[in-house]
Amino acid sequence: LPIDGTRQQYDNMLEQFFTEHPNIHHCITLGSKAHVMGDFLLRTNRREVQIMGYDMVKKNAECLRQGSISFLIAQHAYQQGYCSVDALFKAVVLKKKIQPVNYMPIELLTPENVNFYRRTQL
């Protein structure tokens, strides 16, 4: 879906997609707009489609609670940004060798645990 599309454009594209591909039952969104598809599935009563999305934003959480999104991957953006700048500082300014890969935590949110999620700085 285009980033700057309207709800009507999204609805038309999704309706065409699901009409042409009726056997699709699992979807993933690779951005914070899983709610666009979640809202569409609720409005069109397509309960057989499961969505995995990214980012704990308000609209995604609402769709998760309503069941149109199966689960969300919550990332810790503050920690990711801090660790990136810290690694850059150590490499460029302090001339230290840094790890080429730095793993960051994620959390899987479901309708059952979303109300207990607390975004914290780890």
Where does each model-flagged region fall?
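Short, well-structured alpha-helical segments in soluble
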Residues: 9-23
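Phosphate- and divalent-cation-binding pockets in alpha/beta enzyme and binding domains
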Residues: 36-37
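Venus flytrap/periplasmic-binding-protein-like
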Residues: 29-32, 42-70, 110
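Hinge/beta->alpha junction and helix N-cap segments in small-molecule ligand-binding domains
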Residues: 1-12, 29-33, 55-57, 76-80
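Hinge/cleft segment of the Venus flytrap/periplasmic-binding protein
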Residues: 76-122
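Local beta-strand N-terminus motif with an aromatic residue
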Residues: 23-24, 69
